[in-house]
Design a protein with these regions (language model features):
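A cross-family detector of function-defining hotspots
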Residues: 30, 93-132, 158-204, 210-213, ...
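Hydrophobic alpha-helical membrane-insertion segments, chiefly the h-region
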Residues: 7, 11-22
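Second-shell loop/turn segments in exported
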Residues: 82-89, 145-152
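Hydrophobic single-pass membrane-insertion segments
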Residues: 18-32
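Short acidic N-proximal helix/loop "leader" segments that mark the beginning
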Residues: 60-80
Length: 222
């Protein structure tokens, strides 16, 4: 009996050892084939560019007193500039009279004072009136479609201006620049205080204006 009992116990012990060895082998195999998990974090950098707001000279900075306007707008891309004004708006008109003549209200683009600039609320772009002590004394044109009564304007050459008006043109070179002012001086004594000015880059006209002295010959905003 004892022999049989020892045989059974020995067999059981061997079986247990073999089973434990199998478990260890399985664990070693798991560790060998387990792939480490790597987590990659992507950092995103957002760059914000500051927005700079530039106040344009043609941006309204206020309003003029309310005025009743009757009729249609009279200024358009076919308007013509002359020594005395722009179509129905003539130099010497009060602000109210000029707005009524233009068929639209004006809005200041520089602070109101004894001298300020204003643009029409309706009509073509590129028109700026100079208001001096409540009267219109000058108009600047930066619209290539608006031309003189002779049909010249922005984009035309200095040569054409000189050929067309001859001795009535006085040329001034702006300091430290290749730009020039070609100034039309009327021969009629009744227009002696008026001028039409063509500004060039040295070759072609880039801007024009007209008005009364002394404001018409100013190169800086009043």
């Amino acid at each position: 009996m004892r022999f049989i009992l020892f045989s059974i116990l020995g067999t059981a012990l061997v079986a247990a050892i073999i089973w434990l060895g199998a478990i260890d082998t399985d664990n070693n195999d798991f560790q060998a084939f387990q792939t480490p998990i790597t987590t990659t974090t992507t950092s995103t950098t957002t760059t914000t560019t500051p927005t700079t707001t530039v106040l344009s000279p043609k941006t309204p900075v206020g309003t003029l007193p309310e005025i009743k306007i009757e009729g249609a707008v009279t200024l358009d891309n076919f308007s013509s500039i002359s020594t005395v004004g722009l179509d129905t708006v003539t130099f010497g008109m009060t602000v109210n009279a000029a707005q009524k003549a233009a068929g639209t209200r004006f809005s200041p683009v520089t602070p109101r004072g004894e001298c300020f600039l204003a643009i029409p609320d309706r009509g073509p772009d590129g028109i700026t009136f100079w208001i001096i002590e409540n009267t219109v004394e000058r108009v600047d044109v930066e619209n290539e479609l608006i031309r003189t009564r002779s049909g010249v304007g922005i984009g035309d050459t200095e040569l054409l201006i000189n050929e067309l008006f001859g001795e009535k043109i006085e040329t001034r070179v702006l300091p430290n620049s290749s730009e020039k002012l070609l100034i039309y001086v009327p021969s009629d004594s009744s227009d002696k205080d008026f001028r039409v000015v063509f500004k060039s880059n040295g070759r072609v006209i880039t801007k024009l204006w007209s008005g009364r002295l002394p404001w018409v010959e100013m190169t800086e905003i009043c």
